[in-house]
């Protein structure tokens, strides 16, 4: 009985990881590419990889806090647009802008990494 439970616990993370990787289907549609692609592109263009733990410790106002020894490149969630008046077309479109999507993807990757660390 204990062996069965322990084997199921070992298989659970593998199943979760396969489900996550299979849900990222890059060939679905033009606007629905691989979710990690935006962050990878950001890193390839010279963006410094952000530390997830540093981001979650930041102030709620989202002011950029530099970590000593690191260059002052900003993470996807560091800068955001203030209150910009929306046009009539934008008001009815609920799709978030590219920046907030990049921020959401970054935070999602941080959460996935935090789940993978204890294993």
Curated annotation (Swiss-Prot):
Cysteine disulfide links: 75-103, 77-110
Organism annotation: Homo sapiens (Human)
Location of the region described as Disordered in the Swiss-Prot/TrEMBL record: 81-100
Statement: the UniProt record of this protein carries the keyword Secreted: yes
Residue spans of biased composition, Basic residues class: 82-100
GO cellular component, one term: extracellular space
Domain of life: Eukaryota
Name recorded for this polypeptide: C-X-C motif chemokine 17
Protein family (similarity comment): Belongs to the intercrine alpha (chemokine CxC) family.
Signal peptide range: 1-21
Modifications the protein undergoes after translation, according to the UniProt entry: Likely to undergo an endoproteolytic process to form a four-cysteine-containing mature peptide with a canonical CXC chemokine scaffold after secretion.
Site, as annotated: Cleavage: 63-64
Induction: Found to be up-regulated in duodenal mucosa during acute cholera.
Main location: secreted
Classification via InterPro entries: CXCL17 (IPR029183)
Keywords from the named record: Angiogenesis, Chemotaxis, Cleavage on pair of basic residues, Developmental protein, Differentiation, Disulfide bond, Secreted, Signal
Subcellular localization(s) per the UniProt record: Secreted
Amino-acid biosynthesis recorded as keyword: no
Reported function: Chemokine that acts as a chemoattractant for monocytes, macrophages and dendritic cells. Plays a role in angiogenesis and possibly in the development of tumors. Acts as an anti-inflammatory in the stomach. May play a role in the innate defense against infections. Activates the C-X-C chemokine receptor GPR35 to induce a rapid and transient rise in the level of intracellular calcium ions.
Lineage: Eukaryota, Metazoa, Chordata, Craniata, Vertebrata
Gene Ontology terms describing biological process: angiogenesis; cell differentiation; macrophage chemotaxis; negative regulation of inflammatory response; positive regulation of ERK1 and ERK2 cascade; positive regulation of macrophage chemotaxis; positive regulation of monocyte chemotaxis; positive regulation of vascular endothelial growth factor production
Annotated tissue distribution: Detected in trachea, stomach, lung and skeletal muscle. Detected in intestine and in normal and asthmatic lung (at protein level). Breast tumors showed 3- to 24-fold up-regulation.
């Amino acid at each position: 009985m204990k062996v069965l439970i322990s084997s199921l616990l070992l298989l659970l993370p593998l199943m979760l990881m396969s489900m996550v990787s299979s849900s990222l289907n890059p060939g679905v549609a033009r606007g629905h590419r691989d979710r990690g692609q935006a962050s990878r592109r950001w890193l390839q263009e010279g963006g410094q990889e952000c530390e997830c733990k540093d981001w979650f410790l930041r102030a709620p106002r989202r002011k950029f806090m530099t970590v000593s020894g690191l260059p002052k490149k900003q993470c996807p969630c560091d800068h955001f647009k203030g209150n910009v008046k929306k046009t009539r077309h934008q008001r009815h479109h609920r799709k978030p802008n590219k920046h907030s999507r990049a921020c959401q993807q970054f935070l999602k990757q941080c959460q996935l990494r935090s789940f993978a660390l204890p294993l």
